[in-house]
């Protein structure tokens, strides 16, 4: 495994593989790698000869300075994990390398519509930061394939639209969320939880499954469902952030034509902001069927 911090160095190294006709798969990360990230790496290996991973905590996508400062940075441990996975190339730039003139003078990439609804409405500029860094990394790495976790459902939709709109010749692969044994979606931010908070955190996934069961059982009073779900989170000591029930294809409000919904959830617990999502087929099930499916794993980093 070779590690590069400079753009010219990693670009030059990867051009050698391109000239040899070897296929490149790319996994962009912000480090503090866990099994979810490693699942992306393994999926990338299925699609390509060369696997490239980037580790970069992108300041442009953070809307709170404390969140950026608290984000775990574990580079040495990350490199050890990537070595064990047989990754070929790791790109570890600094903010000064990626944004040499600072964020204020950086050209940005903005995806209209999808970037300003749902999470984008409450975190202005977040998705612009995501698409700008992903676009820049794509230009540096020039991958044939890129793998992203489905846990960040809206982010994946935004990236797919950017790739389509800009006619990028890159195949985007969505990889299902990896979960802990108790259902909690794996996340770099889980490391911020205290022992007590970690024990309460799975309530987010359980509440999400309850919402899914309610929808499959035929309920369409979405505002009431969300209110009840928020009460469940508060009762467990979580602070609800956002819950949306939307059309999984468009991320717009559900209509009679919607065939699949998506539940998008976030909540604060201690220093961590937890997120999760699950898709739900809009076919009304019997009460027994809905209850039997209530424990199924959710779709979603």
Swiss-Prot record:
Primary residence: cytoplasm
InterPro entries listed in its UniProt record: Cyt_trans-like (IPR004821), Pantoate_ligase (IPR003721), Pantoate_ligase_C (IPR042176), Rossmann-like_a/b/a_fold (IPR014729)
Gene3D superfamilies xrefs: HUPs, Pantoate-beta-alanine ligase, C-terminal domain
tRNA-binding in keyword set: no
Record's keyword terms, sorted: ATP-binding, Cytoplasm, Ligase, Nucleotide-binding, Pantothenate biosynthesis
Function: Catalyzes the condensation of pantoate with beta-alanine in an ATP-dependent reaction via a pantoyl-adenylate intermediate.
Protein name: Pantothenate synthetase
